[in-house]
């Protein structure tokens, strides 16, 4: 079944040139431009490209630089964290806590502070960041976020071999589902019989676990009669569980 899926769409990453499409031929992946993500503009994408060679010991240090640059706002940084853009600094769950502490609470950092206060707060933020354990976001929540803001799922989790996200549904004739494989990151099409689809309707953004499937010959109609297409097959869902 995996062979029926094609090239994988990967998430953008800090230090890549994501001003446009980024192709990794070795990994057989392609990343969309940062500007395709909701609330991420060209100025932000350009600035991140310019900063690609900068070295940061902690994520807090990067946030401090962002605080002084008008290309960044809290919402854009939050979205990029959730999409794994800054994964070199840690997991999304951990970085979200650092980001929250940076803007709220007793050790928040602001360009309005005097330099001595900024240095004191940054030292405290670095210590706070180092004290945190890695923590992720629930898988289903993460994928739904990716669909909403990036337009498609990006997360890959190899152990979830039967888990798929529904990208869109064509309900003409036997419904066709365009699916994203969470285990491989690839997309493909599966068909489902109408009676089964009516009992368990699906729409774009839903997630399902495939319980059974079959490969069957593809048919075409000639003079009003179904005829098999030589050498062509289709994947059919036989049983699934909506999550």
Regions found by a protein language model. Give the residues of each.
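Short nucleic-acid-contacting surface segments enriched for D/E, G, S/T with interspersed K/R
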Residues: 195-211
């Amino acid at each position: 079944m995996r062979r029926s899926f094609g090239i994988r769409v990967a998430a953008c990453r800090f230090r890549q040139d994501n001003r446009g499409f980024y192709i990794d031929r070795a990994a057989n992946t392609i990343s969309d431009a940062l500007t395709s993500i909701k609330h991420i503009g060209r100025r932000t994408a350009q600035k991140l490209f310019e900063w690609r060679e900068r070295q940061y010991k902690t994520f807090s240090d990067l946030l401090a630089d962002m605080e002084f640059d008008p290309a960044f706002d809290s919402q854009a940084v939050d979205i990029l964290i959730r999409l794994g853009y800054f994964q070199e600094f840690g997991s999304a769950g951990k970085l979200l806590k650092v980001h929250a502490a940076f803007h709220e609470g007793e050790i928040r950092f602001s360009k309005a502070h005097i330099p001595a206060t900024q240095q004191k707060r940054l030292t405290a933020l670095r210590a706070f960041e180092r004290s945190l354990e890695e923590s992720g976001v629930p898988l289903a929540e993460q994928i739904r976020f990716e669909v909403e803001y990036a337009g498609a799922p990006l997360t890959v989790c190899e152990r979830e071999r039967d888990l798929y996200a529904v990208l869109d549904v064509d309900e003409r004739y036997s419904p066709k589902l365009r699916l994203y494989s969470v285990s491989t990151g690839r997309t493909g099409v599966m068909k489902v019989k109408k009676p089964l689809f009516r009992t368990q309707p699906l729409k774009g953004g839903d997630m399902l676990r495939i319980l059974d499937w079959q490969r069957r010959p593809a048919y075409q109609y000639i003079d009003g009669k179904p005829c098999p297409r030589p050498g062509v097959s289709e994947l059919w869902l036989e049983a699934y569980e909506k999550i």
